[in-house]
C-alpha cells in the first residue's frame, strides 16, 4: 500500500514481549539501509540483552541484516519463509543462532506475487 517492499520484522524478548517492530522502508525513505530487520533493530533502542532476544521476519534475512544479527548477538531468528530468498540464515545457524523457518504459505505467496510484479525493485533490494 505504501509502495515499498512488503517485508516486516519485529524484535521480541524470549518471553514474547514486543520490543519493537519495523518494515522495509527503503523505497519510502530513499534509503537503502532501511530493511525490515534494521528498522526494527533501530526502533528497539540501545540494549544489552540481545542474546535473549528473538528477531521475527517475513523473509530470510539478507547478508546485511544477517550481519546485524551476528554483530549484536541476537539469540534467535524466526523466519516466515525462505523459499523466495534464502538469505544468510544457514550462516547464522552455523554461528549458533537459533533459526526457525516457518515456511508460512501466506508469506511465500506475498513475496512471490510482489517479486513477479516488481522484479526490478526486488533485485535492487537484494543487491542484484
Regions from the language model: what does each represent?
Residues 1-4:
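Short, basic/aromatic recognition patches
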Residues 13, 20-112:
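Zn2+-dependent cytidine deaminase-like catalytic core
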Residues 107-128:
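Secretory/periplasmic and organellar redox-cofactor proteins
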Amino acid at each position: 500500500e505504501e509502495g515499498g517492499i512488503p517485508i516486516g520484522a519485529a524484535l521480541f524478548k524470549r518471553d514474547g514481549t514486543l520490543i519493537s517492530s519495523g518494515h522495509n522502508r527503503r523505497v519510502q525513505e530513499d534509503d537503502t539501509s532501511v530493511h525490515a530487520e534494521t528498522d526494527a533493530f533501530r526502533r528497539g533502542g540501545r540494549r544489552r540483552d540481545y542474546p535473549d532476544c528473538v528477531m521475527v521476519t517475513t523473509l530470510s534475512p539478507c547478508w546485511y541484516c544477517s550481519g546485524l544479527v551476528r554483530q549484536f548477538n541476537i539469540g534467535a531468528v524466526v523466519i516466515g519463509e525462505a523459499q523466495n530468498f534464502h538469505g544468510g540464515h544457514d550462516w547464522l545457524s552455523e554461528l549458533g543462532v537459533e533459526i526457525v523457518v516457518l515456511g508460512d504459505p501466506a508469506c511465500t505467496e506475498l513475496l512471490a506475487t510482489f517479486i513477479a510484479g516488481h522484479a526490478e525493485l526486488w533485485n535492487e533490494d537484494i543487491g542484484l
